[in-house]
Amino acid sequence: MNKRLKLEDNGMELDLEQTMEKVLFEVEYHKNNYFEALENKEFDKDDFVETQKQFYYAVTFFSRPMGVLAAKIPTPELRLEIVRNFWEEHGEGDTSNIHQNTFAELLNRMGNVDKETVNDTHLSPYVRIFNTVLVGTCTLEDYRVGVAMMGIIEHMFSDISGIIGRGIIANDWVKEENMIHYNVHETLDIKHSKDFFDVIEKDWNESAHNKYLIKQGLELGAVLFNNLYEDLYKSRKNRY
Protein backbone atom coordinates (compact mmCIF):
# COMPACT_ATOMS: atom_id res chain seq x y z
CA MET A 1 0.00 0.00 0.00
CA ASN A 2 1.11 3.56 -0.70
CA LYS A 3 2.96 4.91 2.35
CA ARG A 4 0.74 7.97 2.39
CA LEU A 5 -2.30 5.77 2.93
CA LYS A 6 -0.72 4.27 6.04
CA LEU A 7 -1.08 7.61 7.80
CA GLU A 8 -4.67 6.73 8.59
CA ASP A 9 -3.55 3.55 10.34
CA ASN A 10 -1.33 5.68 12.59
CA GLY A 11 -4.23 7.84 13.69
CA MET A 12 -3.34 10.76 11.42
CA GLU A 13 -6.20 12.19 9.39
CA LEU A 14 -5.73 12.14 5.63
CA ASP A 15 -5.82 15.35 3.62
CA LEU A 16 -7.90 15.71 0.44
CA GLU A 17 -5.26 14.37 -1.93
CA GLN A 18 -4.46 11.42 0.32
CA THR A 19 -8.15 10.62 0.65
CA MET A 20 -8.48 10.59 -3.13
CA GLU A 21 -5.50 8.23 -3.40
CA LYS A 22 -7.05 5.95 -0.78
CA VAL A 23 -10.33 5.81 -2.70
CA LEU A 24 -8.52 4.96 -5.94
CA PHE A 25 -6.45 2.31 -4.19
CA GLU A 26 -9.60 0.64 -2.90
CA VAL A 27 -11.39 0.75 -6.27
CA GLU A 28 -8.40 -0.97 -7.96
CA TYR A 29 -9.29 0.37 -11.39
CA HIS A 30 -5.91 -0.70 -12.79
CA LYS A 31 -7.20 -4.27 -12.50
CA ASN A 32 -10.21 -3.44 -14.67
CA ASN A 33 -10.80 -6.13 -17.32
CA TYR A 34 -10.95 -3.46 -20.03
CA PHE A 35 -7.41 -2.23 -19.41
CA GLU A 36 -5.92 -5.65 -18.73
CA ALA A 37 -7.29 -7.03 -22.00
CA LEU A 38 -5.90 -4.05 -23.90
CA GLU A 39 -2.47 -4.25 -22.28
CA ASN A 40 -2.28 -8.03 -22.81
CA LYS A 41 -3.29 -7.67 -26.49
CA GLU A 42 -6.36 -9.81 -25.88
CA PHE A 43 -8.85 -7.15 -27.05
CA ASP A 44 -10.28 -7.79 -30.52
CA LYS A 45 -9.90 -4.59 -32.54
CA ASP A 46 -13.49 -4.50 -33.78
CA ASP A 47 -14.75 -4.97 -30.23
CA PHE A 48 -12.44 -2.26 -28.93
CA VAL A 49 -13.56 0.20 -31.60
CA GLU A 50 -17.18 -0.57 -30.75
CA THR A 51 -16.57 0.26 -27.08
CA GLN A 52 -14.83 3.47 -28.07
CA LYS A 53 -17.78 4.43 -30.26
CA GLN A 54 -19.86 4.14 -27.11
CA PHE A 55 -17.32 6.12 -25.09
CA TYR A 56 -17.66 8.91 -27.65
CA TYR A 57 -21.07 9.61 -26.11
CA ALA A 58 -19.46 10.01 -22.69
CA VAL A 59 -16.93 12.43 -24.18
CA THR A 60 -19.61 14.52 -25.89
CA PHE A 61 -21.71 14.71 -22.72
CA PHE A 62 -19.06 15.33 -20.07
CA SER A 63 -18.91 19.11 -20.37
CA ARG A 64 -22.67 19.51 -19.89
CA PRO A 65 -22.87 18.53 -16.21
CA MET A 66 -19.69 20.57 -15.78
CA GLY A 67 -21.60 23.62 -17.01
CA VAL A 68 -24.43 22.95 -14.55
CA LEU A 69 -21.93 22.53 -11.74
CA ALA A 70 -20.16 25.81 -12.51
CA ALA A 71 -23.40 27.70 -11.94
CA LYS A 72 -23.64 26.26 -8.41
CA ILE A 73 -20.15 27.30 -7.24
CA PRO A 74 -20.74 30.06 -4.66
CA THR A 75 -17.96 32.53 -5.54
CA PRO A 76 -16.81 33.85 -8.93
CA GLU A 77 -13.16 33.22 -8.06
CA LEU A 78 -13.78 29.49 -7.53
CA ARG A 79 -16.29 29.36 -10.37
CA LEU A 80 -13.54 30.42 -12.76
CA GLU A 81 -11.69 27.15 -12.11
CA ILE A 82 -14.61 25.20 -13.59
CA VAL A 83 -15.35 27.74 -16.33
CA ARG A 84 -11.73 27.53 -17.49
CA ASN A 85 -12.01 23.74 -17.58
CA PHE A 86 -15.30 24.02 -19.50
CA TRP A 87 -13.66 26.35 -22.03
CA GLU A 88 -10.77 23.95 -22.59
CA GLU A 89 -13.25 21.10 -23.15
CA HIS A 90 -14.51 23.22 -26.02
CA GLY A 91 -11.10 23.61 -27.61
CA GLU A 92 -10.68 27.15 -26.28
CA GLY A 93 -12.88 28.32 -29.15
CA ASP A 94 -11.14 26.27 -31.86
CA THR A 95 -13.80 23.84 -33.12
CA SER A 96 -11.18 21.43 -34.47
CA ASN A 97 -9.89 20.98 -30.91
CA ILE A 98 -13.26 20.46 -29.23
CA HIS A 99 -12.75 17.19 -27.41
CA GLN A 100 -15.60 15.32 -29.05
CA ASN A 101 -14.13 16.26 -32.44
CA THR A 102 -10.63 15.04 -31.60
CA PHE A 103 -12.13 11.80 -30.31
CA ALA A 104 -14.15 11.37 -33.51
CA GLU A 105 -10.95 11.86 -35.50
CA LEU A 106 -9.24 9.17 -33.43
CA LEU A 107 -12.06 6.75 -34.25
CA ASN A 108 -11.57 7.55 -37.92
CA ARG A 109 -7.82 6.97 -37.76
CA MET A 110 -8.15 3.78 -35.74
CA GLY A 111 -11.18 2.10 -37.27
CA ASN A 112 -12.05 4.09 -40.39
CA VAL A 113 -15.23 5.15 -38.61
CA ASP A 114 -16.66 8.41 -39.90
CA LYS A 115 -18.58 10.82 -37.70
CA GLU A 116 -21.90 9.99 -39.37
CA THR A 117 -21.47 6.32 -38.44
CA VAL A 118 -20.66 7.25 -34.85
CA ASN A 119 -23.71 9.50 -34.63
CA ASP A 120 -25.90 6.66 -35.93
CA THR A 121 -24.70 4.35 -33.15
CA HIS A 122 -27.34 3.80 -30.48
CA LEU A 123 -26.41 4.74 -26.95
CA SER A 124 -25.81 1.74 -24.69
CA PRO A 125 -27.55 1.63 -21.28
CA TYR A 126 -24.14 1.65 -19.60
CA VAL A 127 -23.10 4.99 -21.06
CA ARG A 128 -26.56 6.39 -20.37
CA ILE A 129 -26.21 5.36 -16.72
CA PHE A 130 -22.83 7.11 -16.55
CA ASN A 131 -24.09 10.32 -18.15
CA THR A 132 -27.30 10.39 -16.12
CA VAL A 133 -25.49 9.97 -12.81
CA LEU A 134 -23.10 12.79 -13.75
CA VAL A 135 -25.80 15.30 -14.60
CA GLY A 136 -28.08 14.16 -11.78
CA THR A 137 -25.34 14.58 -9.19
CA CYS A 138 -24.22 17.95 -10.52
CA THR A 139 -27.81 19.21 -10.66
CA LEU A 140 -29.37 17.85 -7.48
CA GLU A 141 -26.57 17.22 -5.00
CA ASP A 142 -24.50 19.68 -2.98
CA TYR A 143 -21.86 21.22 -5.23
CA ARG A 144 -19.07 19.65 -3.15
CA VAL A 145 -20.29 16.17 -4.09
CA GLY A 146 -20.36 17.08 -7.78
CA VAL A 147 -16.97 18.78 -7.76
CA ALA A 148 -15.31 15.83 -6.01
CA MET A 149 -16.96 13.37 -8.39
CA MET A 150 -15.87 15.25 -11.51
CA GLY A 151 -12.40 15.87 -10.10
CA ILE A 152 -11.61 12.23 -9.40
CA ILE A 153 -12.93 11.22 -12.83
CA GLU A 154 -10.59 13.76 -14.45
CA HIS A 155 -7.73 12.40 -12.33
CA MET A 156 -8.50 8.83 -13.35
CA PHE A 157 -8.87 9.76 -17.00
CA SER A 158 -5.39 11.25 -17.08
CA ASP A 159 -4.00 7.86 -16.06
CA ILE A 160 -6.48 5.89 -18.18
CA SER A 161 -5.63 8.00 -21.24
CA GLY A 162 -2.02 6.87 -20.91
CA ILE A 163 -3.07 3.23 -20.57
CA ILE A 164 -5.42 3.34 -23.56
CA GLY A 165 -3.12 5.45 -25.72
CA ARG A 166 -0.18 3.11 -25.16
CA GLY A 167 -2.44 0.11 -25.74
CA ILE A 168 -3.69 1.43 -29.07
CA ILE A 169 -0.12 2.03 -30.23
CA ALA A 170 1.16 -1.32 -28.90
CA ASN A 171 -1.61 -3.13 -30.79
CA ASP A 172 -0.58 -1.21 -33.93
CA TRP A 173 -4.05 0.19 -34.43
CA VAL A 174 -2.69 3.75 -34.71
CA LYS A 175 0.91 4.83 -35.21
CA GLU A 176 2.40 6.88 -32.40
CA GLU A 177 2.81 9.91 -34.65
CA ASN A 178 -0.90 9.73 -35.53
CA MET A 179 -2.18 9.42 -31.96
CA ILE A 180 -4.71 12.07 -31.03
CA HIS A 181 -6.96 12.83 -28.04
CA TYR A 182 -5.57 10.37 -25.50
CA ASN A 183 -2.05 11.78 -25.63
CA VAL A 184 -3.47 15.24 -24.89
CA HIS A 185 -5.68 14.12 -22.01
CA GLU A 186 -2.86 12.19 -20.36
CA THR A 187 -1.34 15.54 -19.39
CA LEU A 188 -4.26 18.00 -19.65
CA ASP A 189 -6.52 16.17 -17.22
CA ILE A 190 -3.94 16.37 -14.45
CA LYS A 191 -4.54 20.12 -14.57
CA HIS A 192 -8.30 19.69 -14.95
CA SER A 193 -8.39 17.48 -11.86
CA LYS A 194 -6.44 20.06 -9.86
CA ASP A 195 -8.87 22.77 -10.98
CA PHE A 196 -11.75 20.83 -9.45
CA PHE A 197 -9.94 20.02 -6.22
CA ASP A 198 -8.84 23.64 -5.80
CA VAL A 199 -12.54 24.52 -5.56
CA ILE A 200 -13.14 22.23 -2.56
CA GLU A 201 -9.76 22.40 -0.79
CA LYS A 202 -10.93 25.08 1.64
CA ASP A 203 -14.26 23.31 2.18
CA TRP A 204 -12.42 20.10 3.06
CA ASN A 205 -10.59 21.81 5.91
CA GLU A 206 -13.64 23.61 7.32
CA SER A 207 -15.85 20.86 8.74
CA ALA A 208 -16.49 17.15 9.15
CA HIS A 209 -19.73 17.54 7.18
CA ASN A 210 -17.85 18.97 4.22
CA LYS A 211 -15.41 16.06 4.38
CA TYR A 212 -18.35 13.67 4.30
CA LEU A 213 -19.83 15.31 1.20
CA ILE A 214 -16.49 15.35 -0.60
CA LYS A 215 -15.76 11.72 0.27
CA GLN A 216 -19.18 10.81 -1.11
CA GLY A 217 -18.29 12.49 -4.39
CA LEU A 218 -14.85 10.87 -4.58
CA GLU A 219 -16.24 7.40 -3.99
CA LEU A 220 -19.13 7.90 -6.39
CA GLY A 221 -16.88 9.15 -9.20
CA ALA A 222 -14.30 6.40 -8.82
CA VAL A 223 -16.84 3.57 -8.69
CA LEU A 224 -18.94 5.05 -11.50
CA PHE A 225 -16.02 5.48 -13.90
CA ASN A 226 -14.51 2.09 -13.11
CA ASN A 227 -17.90 0.44 -13.63
CA LEU A 228 -18.31 2.16 -16.99
CA TYR A 229 -15.19 0.47 -18.35
CA GLU A 230 -16.17 -2.89 -16.86
CA ASP A 231 -19.58 -2.56 -18.50
CA LEU A 232 -18.05 -1.55 -21.83
CA TYR A 233 -15.84 -4.62 -21.72
CA LYS A 234 -18.72 -6.88 -20.71
CA SER A 235 -20.82 -5.60 -23.64
CA ARG A 236 -17.95 -5.41 -26.17
CA LYS A 237 -19.60 -7.96 -28.50
CA ASN A 238 -22.80 -5.95 -28.71
CA ARG A 239 -23.41 -3.78 -31.75
CA TYR A 240 -25.79 -0.97 -30.92
PLM regions with names:
Residues N2-Y240:
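Non-heme di-metal
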